[in-house]
């Protein structure tokens, strides 16, 4: 891995430096060529660094600021009035070429607003989209977008999301010709609102996208497709519902395995397999949503993420930076739009 720098808004999220700094130290151990800029309150950050090895400490820079975007800040307010916030300064490092990607667990709306203004969207992209992974029965990643950055979308925007999702699957998972579907209330061509139907027609006209049609909610986790596209209203509800069901299943499984002597004995015997299943079902295993469609890389972590989950988000940011995802999306989109116009 060539040297790369991540800018981390370590003050964002429910736990701030208590989680973000220890997780970053783990990432620095995993990636010897990784450098980080920790943006936030320096005394609070330093509190979690005394035990860091000198070789690790040399790859850490601290950019001090005491201003933070709160979870209650409206996006416009954060954009206009939080110009020295840890979130904004982290994004500015990407804009200025001092970091290849940034990560924040802070206010999603503010992150989108600030990132869009500072980094700008790629040519041919009207709006950035939030995208993340869903688990599937075949254990391969399935990308779902948009997850809430755009509550309502026209057909052209959905088409752009499909292109970006396809390129993401290719870049991150080395997936040739990823299968792309539109989330709908039925698989028949007559089903769905005008926006979804028109987006389907646009995708059918694009031979470079492996569009397979509509997909219903009960097929989300089948692994039959690689990219699922919808507007942010539907996507956010889908994601939160999925996370809620996963937590319920994990909780019920853990409770069931502690009832009775023989059940506990069997649970111990098959513990490795059970732990593997629980890990696959745990939403933390899929932490990290990418704000794609921008000229720079921005990754959003869950605000409630623990160290393990935050480390997953760092890993995602590193992967996208290594693959130069924005450049890949830009080149592919240009080729696809040229195909359609011809």
From Swiss-Prot:
Q: Known EC number(s)?
A: 2.3.1.274
Catalytic activity reads: a fatty acyl-[ACP] + phosphate = an acyl phosphate + holo-[ACP]
Q: InterPro entries, per this entry?
A: FA_synthesis (IPR003664), Phospholipid_synth_PlsX-like (IPR012281)
Compartment(s): Cytoplasm
Gene Ontology annotations for the cellular component aspect, listed alphabetically = cytoplasm
Major enzyme class: transferase
According to its UniProt record, in which pathway does this protein act?
Lipid metabolism; phospholipid metabolism
Per its record, what are the GO molecular function terms?
phosphate:acyl-[acyl carrier protein] acyltransferase activity
Q: Which UniProt keywords apply?
A: Cytoplasm, Lipid biosynthesis, Lipid metabolism, Phospholipid biosynthesis, Phospholipid metabolism, Transferase
What GO biological process terms are annotated to this protein in UniProt? fatty acid biosynthetic process; phospholipid biosynthetic process
How it assembles, according to the record, is:
Homodimer. Probably interacts with PlsY.
General function of this protein: Catalyzes the reversible formation of acyl-phosphate (acyl-PO(4)) from acyl-[acyl-carrier-protein] (acyl-ACP). This enzyme utilizes acyl-ACP as fatty acyl donor, but not acyl-CoA.
- Which NCBIfam families does the UniProt entry name for this protein? plsX (TIGR00182)
Give the record's family classification. Answer: Belongs to the PlsX family.
Question: What name goes with this protein?
Answer: Phosphate acyltransferase
